[in-house]
Amino acid sequence: MAAADTPSATLRHHDLCSRGIRLARKMRSDVTDLLDIYVERQGLDASISVAAVDGVPTAAVERWAEQTGTQRLLDNLAAYRAFRTLLAQMLEEQRELLGDTDAELGPALAAMLLQVSAFVYHLEELLELESRGAPAEEGSEPPAPPRLSLFEQKLRGLRVLRELAQWAVRSVRDLRQLSKHGPGSGAALGLPESQ
């Protein structure tokens, strides 16, 4: 019996998926609250439409049902690593702009950054259990983002938070699918099972 197929590995896999679902749900709830604070503090209209922004991963995926569990985990990991970088940039821009005078938005962004970092670690644990180590981050330091106007920074931040909320929903779906199967399952997980 392979190590990934042992009862203890299966139990750990299920536990990690369940905890991941709870983390993603909490993140979704918190990012929704953060969006409200962000829109208010930045003086934006909540209904404003923001086009796709370079570097912000989108949660939409074609052929979601055909993805394997490992593909789902790798997609999630890449997205949350990008969000970790984007949130750190947003936090730094916020601190440059307002310093420590903003007692609500800065701490909320910092808390979200911690949640995203914890979720990255959680996804890496799941990939380890899947008998596939987490890929190394592509570079230690991403290229510096182009200098944006204040308004462009606000719109990029809005897009980042909206997409993060969508990713949290997708992560719950992905982890639910993954939890239905044991560790190391490489088959497509979204397809209906014959009974």
Swiss-Prot record:
It is found in: Cytoplasm. It comes from the Eukaryota. The keyword Magnesium does not apply. GO terms for biological process: astrocyte activation; cell surface receptor signaling pathway via JAK-STAT; ciliary neurotrophic factor-mediated signaling pathway; muscle organ morphogenesis; negative regulation of neuron apoptotic process; negative regulation of photoreceptor cell differentiation; neuron development; positive regulation of axon regeneration. GO terms for molecular function: ciliary neurotrophic factor receptor binding; cytokine activity; growth factor activity; interleukin-6 receptor binding; protein-containing complex binding. Keywords: Cytoplasm, Developmental protein, Differentiation, Growth factor, Neurogenesis. Nervous system. Transmembrane segments: none annotated. Belongs to the CNTF family. It comes from Gallus gallus (Chicken). Pfam families: CNTF. The keyword tRNA-binding does not apply. SUPFAM superfamilies: 4-helical cytokines. CNTF is a survival factor for various neuronal cell types. Seems to prevent the degeneration of motor axons after axotomy. This is Ciliary neurotrophic factor. One of its GO terms (cellular component) is neuronal cell body.
